[in-house]
């Protein structure tokens, strides 16, 4: 390390730092230098203070703050919305399904449920139908599936609406409710 004296294991004269995201050429990075990029609208970038070699702690916007033009709410640094979840599962031209598809989550069967207890699929309460299985509308060429869903025996959570997803105005899914 060019900033340190190997014989003494101390910083060389004139050096402010020897490592860190906010250490450049043995000096603290200038105040305002980005040291951690934003990962989403709910996770602002962090910047060096000019007083330390370390990047400040990773902070997120408060859970529940509206994001993506009110399509979602911040949740642990992300803005989970059903459109993105459908895209991640199925790719382009797939969108959140109509509300009628989510009504299937009241059945408590393979096609729709909110959670499992002792291996049994528990139906969603009417107000929680958008917190169970995720339904997507497939508009890709040659497809006409208005209530597309994903099921995996290996990962029972894949294909379910993610925690923190907006399910109604002012409401998000938590514990599949």
Curated annotation (Swiss-Prot):
Please name the Gene3D superfamilies in this protein's record.
Disintegrin domain
- Which stretch is the leader sequence? none
Position of sequence motif D/ECD-tripeptide: 41-43
According to the record, the segments passing through the membrane are none
Where does the source fall among the domains of life? Answer: Eukaryota
- Which cofactors, by name? Zn(2+)
Does Calcium count among this protein's keywords?
yes
UniProt: Ca(2+) binding residues:
43-44, 46, 58-59
PTM details? Answer: Glycosylated.
Q: Which GO annotations describe the biological process of this protein?
A: proteolysis
Q: Which Pfam families match?
A: ADAM_CR (PF08516), Disintegrin (PF00200)
Asked if the keyword Disulfide bond belongs to this entry, the reply reads: yes
Question: Could you state one GO cellular component term attached to this entry?
Answer: extracellular region
What is this protein's function per UniProt? Snake venom metalloproteinase that impairs hemostasis in the envenomed animal.
Q: Which family does it belong to?
A: Belongs to the venom metalloproteinase (M12B) family. P-III subfamily. P-IIIa sub-subfamily.
Q: How does it assemble?
A: Monomer.
Q: Which PANTHER family does the entry link to?
A: ADAM A DISINTEGRIN AND METALLOPROTEASE DOMAIN (PTHR11905), DISINTEGRIN AND METALLOPROTEINASE DOMAIN-CONTAINING PROTEIN 28 (PTHR11905:SF32)
Record-given protein name: Zinc metalloproteinase-disintegrin-like scutiarin
């Amino acid at each position: 390390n060019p900033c340190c004296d190997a014989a003494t294991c101390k910083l060389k004269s004139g050096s402010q730092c020897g490592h860190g995201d906010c250490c450049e050429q043995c000096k603290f990075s200038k105040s305002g230098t980005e040291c951690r990029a934003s990962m989403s609208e709910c996770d602002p970038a962090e910047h060096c203070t000019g007083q330390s070699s370390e990047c400040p702690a990773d902070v997120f916007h408060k859970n529940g703050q509206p994001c993506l033009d009110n399509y979602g709410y911040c949740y642990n640094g992300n803005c989970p919305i059903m459109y993105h979840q459908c895209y991640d599962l199925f790719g382009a031209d797939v969108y959140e399904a109509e509300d009628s598809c989510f009504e299937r989550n009241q059945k408590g069967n393979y096609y729709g449920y909110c959670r499992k207890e002792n291996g049994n699929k528990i139906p969603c309460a009417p107000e929680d139908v958008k917190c169970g299985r995720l339904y997507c509308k497939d508009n890709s060429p040659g497809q006409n599936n208005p209530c597309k869903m994903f099921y995996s025996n290996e990962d029972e959570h894949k294909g379910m609406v993610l925690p923190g997803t907006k399910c109604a105005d002012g409401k998000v899914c938590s514990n599949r409710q």
